[in-house]
Amino acid sequence: METGSPGKRPVLPKRARLLVTAGMGMLALLLFGPRLVDIYVDWLWFGEVGFRSVWITVLLTRLAIVAAVALVVAGIVLAALLLAYRSRPFFVPDEPQRDPVAPLRSAVMRRPRLFGWGIAVTLGVVCGLIASFDWVKVQLFVHGGTFGIVDPEFGYDIGFFVFDLPFYRSVLNWLFVAVVLAFLASLLTHYLFGGLRLTTGRGMLTQAARVQLAVFAGAVVLLKAVAYWLDRYELLSSGRKEPTFTGAGYTDIHAELPAKLVLVAIAVLCAVSFFTAIFLRDLRIPAMAAALLVLSAILVGGLWPLLMEQFSVRPNAADVERPYIQRNIEATREAYRIGGDWVQYRSYPGIGTKQPRDVPVDVTTIAKVRLLDPHILSRTFTQQQQLKNFFSFAEILDIDRYRIDGELQDYIVGVREFSPKSLTGNQTDWINKHTVYTHGNGFVAAPANRVNAAARDAENISDSNSGYPIYAVSDIASLGSGRQVIPVEQPRVYYGEVIAQADPDYAIVGGAPGSAPREYDTDTSKYTYTGAGGVSIGNWFNRTVFATKVAQHKFLFSREIGSESKVLIHRDPKERVQRVAPWLTTDDNPYPVVVNGRIVWIVDAYTTLDTYPYAQRSSLEGPVTSPTGIVRQGKQVSYVRNSVKATVDAYDGTVTLFQFDRDDPVLRTWMRAFPGTVKSEDQIPDELRAHFRYPEDLFEVQRSLLAKYHVDEPREFFTTNAFWSVPSDPTNDANATQPPFYVLVGDQQSAQPSFRLASAMVGYNREFLSAYISAHSDPANYGKLTVLELPTDTLTQGPQQIQNSMISDTRVASERTLLERSNRIHYGNLLSLPIADGGVLYVEPLYTERISTSPSSSTFPQLSRVLVSVREPRTEGGVRVGYAPTLAESLDQVFGPGTGRVATXPGGDAASAPPPGAGGPAPPQGVPPPRTTQPPAAPPRGPDVPPATVAELRETLADLRAVLDRLEKAIDAAETPGG
């Protein structure tokens, strides 16, 4: 073994150097290889969907941020290290036994450049990588414009607060980080080389160390002065007065704002005092200035606003906060589009004055009453329309409308998707799972206002073939038959909500020309994908990349993969939109529609902000539960617009973004940042526009805000007396709020069917109905909100009270006992419908599901009864309840004979309903024929009574009840002591 000369470092043998190099290469590959694979796959995928420009723009923006921040941080830190090193003392006392940093100093002295550059570059790169997540702020700053609205305090355009201010704050934060790191680096370097020595009872600083540390400390304080200046503008989004209102209140404007200016001045003086240390040896002046700044921050910035809030504002809050509440009301209405330009308020009595059959609008509403609940019927769809075990429908179905033979009809719709979780046995083999079972089959719809037949026999209701949807199926089997109610030319579904539940989510499709198809299509046919979607894996490099990404060697050795093969990834419609437009927030509920013969997913997308001055903060997304069980509030926003409608083709995965709000300055900013990615509103096809729905997530935010922001007067707003609440869901034991519901109702002007999203509202901490909010989805009036306000001096029952009244009705209670012997009962969506020229009609379907003890048997809900309720005329709180197998019979019970004749009767086909009373049972597809036992005939109803006579009798009874109520109250008052 050779030894080097004394003083020289030992040299590794060649073999050892090779091993070290190989080891470092393997380590680098393990660290950076997966990320490089992801980058290359993203490059391929974004190119496939036609949005590679988005990927490149985001990547270049993040790289530019990394470079800029790394350069600034590394440069400042390196300068600090270099200055400290060059100004080190030439003589350091050689006392190793008393100098604990001597070994470290020796190591640094051997390689000073490596340590200096290494520390600076490492810190710079780490800071740059963290800062790259602020790419959204950079793009908004570079491309942001104006709103044309100024804030009420400083008079600046809103664009300054949402586009510029976040960027300035981010730049300031990173400068602050850089200077603090430089200060620490300088401090440690001076300590290491003796410029700073700590001895018993005192410390010693060289002049160079004192100057450098003072300059960096002064720079930190100077940056803090700039931060105080920017804090002034951020007060307009203050949360001090939450939950009452968001934005600067009296204390913020009269205490916090002046305090910030005072602190700016003190911080500047403090910084100057630090800079004087360059000339003065005495550090007591900077120390006293720093103490003054800290004390001022506590007293002026903290204690003074606290005292003002406690002793001046709170005792007089209703008066002193009035102008600031007014600012909050105006800003919130603008930010969420719930102001007078978008919301129409109408007084509504809450008590009907006419028979619904005599009001054209009500005739339309009753004929279109939705009886099918998309939250309940998914299992019914699956059991009756599944075809194969590996097909399934979404857990919650969707509601849409189609015009069939000139008539607008709402349908419960779903896509028969491939369900990876449903594969069993050999179906789960890799070849079968990813190359054979690749797609779903068909679009299934059912008219929402009727079922095949009424279920009458309560004792044998689960054995009857009644209460099931009437299906309109558009799939491979019906392709080209001419029998499709909703024509679909390409029923195969490769992209969907259910199909994307595989982990990992991918399918391998395609084949060489002339090769035998292998994808399952039907029991008698196979198929080869011919769509434009998918990333090519025809070459060995791409196959190796995907084999690495999903950790599956079969990509390399399977004979099923050839030169024409492609892999379909990211098959969830919502995820695809989020990836191609990362600057948008997507709605949680994509829904399928048929447009020009193709199945297309529509995804509502929002532009959002969280710094809109004075606008109330709200959550656009629901609470998020972490894996550890911690519940966190969803993303908080102060501005939201449904500015983009996105579509995803279910066959080839094509993503298209359409501008839907030309007036949104945030969308205009993003369209400048990513030109060509969003198509103009003029390019939306009329057939597609006809299926746009008002999104549920946005509506839920708006209705919760309208519960407060319908109030105009700030003092009344502060007292909360006129507030509303979103009612609890009476059909959900989890005490959740009642979800909004889509309905077809008669338009007030034309009496034609109008598709709307609606919700009842109750009084604040009460259960009586206070308002009814509906959002139009028809193209002509899309986005218009209508609010029907009920008087506060009359009592109209809310959803929870109506539910209690209906289930406590003697007829309902007695039959429920009978039904529950062999069935589970599901209460469907409780619909609130304006009707009878001022009244409110509640309709609730009741579903039963047979209880089975056999694990092999399948049960699913069927519509068994319909409950309706209306307020009793001329009474305080009285209600009428209807309960029958059909809507028509229930309506006759509450309105008298004749009203039920305008309801849609059971039966018919999916394209057209039978005339009232003409519907007979028609077995739905996939359901076995009914048993031979016939349901008992309905009991005789007796002689018909003229409707006028019935109405007179009801009015007389109502008058008698009112008299008895008043008499009972008088007796109670007389018996009460002191009364």
Curated annotation (Swiss-Prot):
Entry similarity comment: Belongs to the UPF0182 family.
Record organism: Mycobacterium tuberculosis (strain CDC 1551 / Oshkosh)
GO cellular component term, pick one: extracellular region
Superkingdom of this protein's organism: Bacteria
Spans through the membrane: 19-41, 63-85, 114-136, 174-196, 208-230, 261-280, 285-307
Keywords annotated in UniProt: Cell membrane, Membrane, Transmembrane, Transmembrane helix
Keyword NAD applies: no
Subcellular location: Cell membrane
Name of the molecule in the record: UPF0182 protein MT0070
HAMAP family xrefs: UPF0182 (MF_01600)
Residue span of region Disordered: 894-948
Membrane topology listed for this record: Multi-pass membrane protein
Record Pfam families: UPF0182
InterPro entries assigned to the protein according to its UniProt record, in alphabetical order: UPF0182 (IPR005372)
Record bears the keyword Cell inner membrane: no
Biased composition (Pro residues): 913-946
